[in-house]
Regions:
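General structural signal for alpha-helix termini and helix-helix connectors
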Residues: 36-39, 70, 74, 91
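Acidic, glycine/proline-rich low-complexity segments that act as flexible tails and inter-domain linkers
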Residues: 1-47, 99-120
């Protein structure tokens, strides 16, 4: 059975909330880093999210893939931009990155369908 990528982010949210409550200083610092990194400067936020997706594939983090696919889509990334980024991740990560790139593409398809109101 194929993973439900939107479902994965939904499943993680309560656990992330618990983590924020249990380690508030660490999570506030992490949030501050994320905000600083994602602020548009030389690269816009969309580009940074697409880069983060490529890194997520290269480091083989399914949870990261789910969150960064959604963020890239929400920032206006296109399927072609995501595919080009996945190609770069595959180039750098070889075989295992091919498998995680397929995860990212499945996540993109599901989040894109959800955004347009389709049930996946």
């Amino acid at each position: 059975m194929e993973a439900s990528w939107p479902g994965l982010t939904d499943q993680l949210r309560p656990h992330l909330k618990d983590l924020r409550g249990g380690a508030p200083e660490v999570m506030k610092a992490f949030s501050a880093i994320a905000q600083a990194v994602l602020a548009p400067k030389a690269l816009d936020t969309k580009t940074k999210e697409v880069v983060a997706l490529g890194i997520s594939v290269a480091i083989r983090c399914d949870d990261c893939i789910a969150f960064h696919v959604k963020a890239a889509l929400d920032q206006g990334a296109t399927r072609d931009e995501v595919l080009e980024t996945l190609g770069t991740a595959i180039y750098l990560g070889a075989g295992p990155s091919v498998m995680y790139a397929s995860h990212a593409l499945a996540a993109w398809t599901q989040f894109e369908a959800a955004k347009s109101g389709q049930v996946f």
